[in-house]
Design a protein with these regions (language model features):
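Copper-binding active sites and cupredoxin-like electron-transfer domains
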Residues: 1-124
Length: 124
C-alpha cells in the first residue's frame, strides 16, 4: 500500500492525501478480507512536503516489521505506526476475533483524513 499525496496547485503543500493514489479509494469499495485469514500489508510512505505519515487501524492490533528486513516484528500489538518519507514496512494482522463488518483504517493526522487518507476493510 502506497501512502501518498498530491500538490494540485503547485504551492508546495499537498491538497489531497491518499493510499494507492486515490483519495478515499477504499471507503466506497472496501478491501475485502476473510475472517481469520492472515493479512500482510506492505506499506511505503512516499508523501512529499510532509515529513511524517501514519497508519492507524480501528478495532484491531498488528505486528509491524520496520523496513521489512527482520524475521521478528519490530513492534508487537500496536494499532498505529509513524513513517518518515520513503520509509517502508510490513503489517501483519487477522480479524479472527471480530464479527463480519467494516473496520476503518486511516492516517492519524486529521488533515490527511479530511483530504482523502481514509479507507475501510470489509471482513467477510
Amino acid at each position: 500500500m502506497v501512502m501518498n499525496g498530491f500538490d494540485t496547485n503547485f504551492d508546495g503543500e499537498n491538497e489531497i492525501y491518499a493510499v494507492n493514489t486515490v483519495a478515499f479509494a477504499y471507503h466506497d469499495r472496501p478491501i475485502r478480507v476473510k475472517r481469520g485469514e492472515l493479512v500482510r500489508m506492505y506499506v511505503v510512505n512516499i508523501l512529499e512536503f510532509d515529513f511524517v505519515n501514519s497508519f492507524h487501524l480501528h478495532a484491531n492490533f498488528f505486528d509491524y516489521y520496520d523496513h521489512g528486513t527482520t524475521l521478528e516484528p519490530t513492534l508487537r500489538i500496536v494499532d498505529t505506526i509513524m513513517q518518515c518519507q520513503a520509509q517502508r514496512g510490513i503489517l501483519e494482522f487477522t480479524f479472527k476475533d471480530h464479527e463480519p463488518g467494516q473496520y476503518m483504517f486511516h492516517a492519524h493526522q486529521t488533515e490527511f483524513v479530511e483530504l482523502g487518507w481514509m479507507s475501510v476493510f470489509e471482513v467477510v
